[in-house]
Every structure is written in C-alpha cells, then in structure tokens.
From Swiss-Prot:
GO terms for cellular component: plasma membrane. InterPro entries: BioY. Probably a biotin-binding protein that interacts with the energy-coupling factor (ECF) ABC-transporter complex. Unlike classic ABC transporters this ECF transporter provides the energy necessary to transport a number of different substrates. The substrates themselves are bound by transmembrane, not extracytoplasmic soluble proteins. The chain crosses the membrane at residues 12-32, 54-74, 78-98, 111-131, 150-170. It holds the Pfam family BioY. This is Biotin transporter BioY2. One of its GO terms (molecular function) is biotin transmembrane transporter activity. Belongs to the BioY family. In E.coli forms a stable energy-coupling factor (ECF) transporter complex composed of 2 membrane-embedded substrate-binding protein (S component), 2 ATP-binding proteins (A and A' components) and 2 transmembrane proteins (T component), probably with a stoichiometry of 2:1:1:2. May be able to interact with more than 1 S component at a time. Keywords: Cell membrane, Membrane, Transmembrane, Transmembrane helix, Transport.
Amino acid sequence: MQNTKLYSLTLIALGAAIIAVLSPLAIPIGIVPVTLQTLAVGLVATVLKARETFFAILLYLLLGFIGIPVFTGGTSGIAVLFGPTGGFLLAFLVMGTLISWGLHQIKYKTIPAFIINIVGHLLMLVIGTLWLKFFTQVDWSLALKLGFTPFVFVEIIKAILVTIFGLALIRALSHTNKYFTN
C-alpha cells in the first residue's frame, strides 16, 4: 500500500514537472499564445490515470499560483491564473481528467483515443474562450476570434501528436510496469 501511494505521488510530481518544463515555451499569436502547455497536459493525461492527471495539473497550477514561473512565457501568479487567459489554464483540469478517464474507459484503443484527445483539447478551448469572453466583456465574435478560431487547427494537431506518442509510450511502459496496463 505504501509503495502504491509513493508511486502515485511520484507520477503526480513527474506529470507536473513535464507540464511546468514545456509550458513556458510559446509562439505568440494574438492574446492567447500557441504553447506546448496543452501538448504537455494532453501527454500527461494520455499516459497517467485520471486521479494522477488531475493532481499533476492541480500541482502545476499551484506552482504558478505561488509565483514559480511555470506559465506561458515564464509568467506566474494570481493575476495570470485569474486573468483574461486564466480560463484556459483552469480548463486543463477538465481537459486532462476527461482525456485520462476516457482513455481508460476505452482501454486505449487507437481511433477512440484520437477522438477523446481531440474532444478534450477542443473542450479546453471552449472553456477558455467562455472565460475570456466574460472576463473581458467582449462580444462573442471577438471572443471566438481571440480565443478559439486561431487555435482549433493547432489543438487538433497537438491532440493527434499526443495520441500517437502517448499510446506508444503506454505500450512501451506496459511491458515493464503494471500501472500502465489496462
């Protein structure tokens, strides 16, 4: 029992570290930059189980909240987490947990895994755009233009990459560790 808890905590810390290392890398386009954050969240969600995924993302958000520069562009703090783009960050909890839970339910079958990852990434965009719209009080057209439309294609590509690499990683790890078996 102790080893299982320790292993789970280790996976949570490792998941948060992966997200934290990749998140500061960004390509600025508009108010919401294209980042490796969603790629990292998707990868963690694809490889880890829902509980570990949720807590890895929560730990990552807490690190940024307390001032460690782990958000896009090396930013951090309450103003980022609860600012105009904070909805995208908070949506990672929903995105990651949904992806992880869904993949476990379908036993990591390839085609459904692509669909689940794409839906998770698009759901994150919807939640983030809703937050952006209500936070900034812009009209729907502008909110979609700033937070959704420019990122749909990129997020679908990220979801496809995450599925390919994540499933390959799970298959490789399942030979050495029963955590990664269905």
